[in-house]
Swiss-Prot record:
The gene is dinB1. InterPro entries: DNA/RNA_pol_sf, DNA_pol_Y-fam_lit_finger_sf, DNA_pol_Y-fam_little_finger, DNA_polymerase-Y, DNApol_IV, IMS_HHH_1, Rev_trsase/Diguanyl_cyclase, UmuC. Residues 23-203 form the UmuC domain. It comes from Agrobacterium fabrum (strain C58 / ATCC 33970). This is DNA polymerase IV 1. Its main location: cytoplasm. GO terms for molecular function: damaged DNA binding; DNA-directed DNA polymerase activity; magnesium ion binding. Monomer.
């Protein structure tokens, strides 16, 4: 690697493996905020925060806001303390999803092997695409980043390597508008100089465990035997051993299944009364059920998520006898879990979802014992038909109607 003779930039000019690498990670830069700035040029030089009201959290902060210390998932009141002049914009997920799909389509023009991680990032396997594009993957990727900014109006950062782990690490190196490469020959030395939090799965809690054992840098992991790491940290020890050496044999898949479907909301004021939480839970359950039905899937485990006024999270779950995509079953299962949590505690957030997803053909067999459940399922099916014909807000249950009072 060498620096530019004209400006001295350390950004890559030459790499011995540049035309041999084919695994890419694409990540849009401050995506939600970038879309808002694209649609309103007056925001170009202003700090922009996309997120909820004062009681919500930051979804995305533009790079100007980040200079002031604003970060994703930061409570909004703290973000505004750090950057009081920020322009706060309520998230428009429909718009972001639309832009994300546009970029995804452009990715799929490069290769059929596109593995989305979210609406604004994905892995791409560009192996074997040279004949199609008449260019090696590195050039194809560089052209792609420029095309996205020109045609869509948002910038992206790209990482190119020989494996998924290092491609993702590389895409974070020079944001925004980054294009970074990590080759196989340099992987060990590149990783050795980085903290253990670079490794997937090493969050704050596990990093603290490693630090208690005197391990802060990946170089220290590289000096340890796999057996010793597994003795100390179990299966995670094997991951530490392999990723610390740049060993990642996972392939890019374009059909990774969705693992869960959920919906949550943050309250404007803390809520402690059970009767006030019930209609909100019902409304969220209907949103989850609607998404399941539209996707042709069902979930067998219902998950209740709550966050207390002091930001402590609670997660409860219950496995059903068979998969469901009915709002009524999701709600009633969640309600049983909720009843054990409403003891006067003040909550700032509630969410409901399902995991352990299955094909919808296995969902909700007739209940031969509870005839009322069968009637409720029939009523829900009738409401679904009305919503399909007249819109989602055309018919509501008594529970959800109470939330609009």
């Amino acid at each position: 690697m060498r620096r530019c003779r004209a400006c001295g930039s350390p950004r890559l000019l030459y790499h011995s493996e540049l035309y041999d690498l084919s695994i890419a990670h694409i990540d849009c830069d401050a995506f939600y905020a970038s879309v808002e700035k694209r649609d309103n040029p007056e925001l170009a030089d202003k700090p922009v925060i996309v997120g909820g009201g004062k009681r919500g959290v930051v979804s995305t902060a533009c790079y100007i806001a980040r200079i002031h210390g604003v970060r994703s998932a930061m409570p909004m009141f703290k973000a505004l303390e750090a950057c009081p002049d920020a322009v706060v914009i309520k998230p428009d997920m429909e718009k972001y999803s639309r832009v994300g799909r546009e970029i995804r389509t452009m990715m799929q023009e490069l290769t059929p092997l596109v593995q989305p991680l979210s609406i604004d990032e994905a892995f791409l396997d560009l192996s074997g695409t040279e004949k199609l594009h008449h260019d090696p993957p590195a050039r194809v990727l560089a052209k792609f980043t420029g095309r996205v900014e020109k045609e869509v109006g948002v910038s992206v950062s790209a990482g190119l390597s020989y494996c998924k782990f290092l491609a993702k690490v590389a895409s974070d190196l020079q944001k925004p508008r980054g294009f970074s490469v990590v080759g196989e020959a340099e992987a060990l030395s590149f990783l050795a100089a980085r903290p253990v939090t670079t490794i997937w799965g090493v969050g704050k809690a596990f990093a603290a465990t490693l630090e208690a054992d005197g391990i802060r840098m990946i170089a220290q992991l590289q000096e340890m035997e796999e057996s010793e790491l597994m003795r100390r940290y179990g299966v995670m020890g094997q991951r530490l051993f392999r990723l610390a050496r740049g060993i990642d044999e996972r392939h890019v898949h374009n059909n990774d299944p969705v693992k869960s479907v959920s919906s949550e909301t943050t309250f404007f004021h803390d809520i402690s009364r059970h009767e006030d939480l019930v209609p909100i839970l019902r409304s969220l359950s209907e949103k989850v059920a609607w998404r399941l039905k539209k996707s042709g899937i069902a979930g067998q485990t219902v998950v209740l998520k709550m966050k207390t006024a002091d930001f402590k999270s609670r997660t409860r779950n219950r496995r059903l006898d068979d998969p469901t995509q009915l709002a009524d079953r999701i709600f009633r299962t969640g309600l049983a879990l909720l009843e054990k949590e409403t003891d006067g505690t003040k909550f700032r957030l509630i969410g409901i979802g399902v995991s352990d997803l299955r094909d919808a053909g296995l969902a909700d067999p007739p209940d031969l014992v509870d005839r009322q459940a069968t009637r409720r399922a029939a009523a829900e099916a009738a409401m679904d038909k009305l919503r399909d014909k007249f819109g989602k807000g055309s018919v509501e249950t008594g529970y959800t109607f109470r939330t609009r009072k």
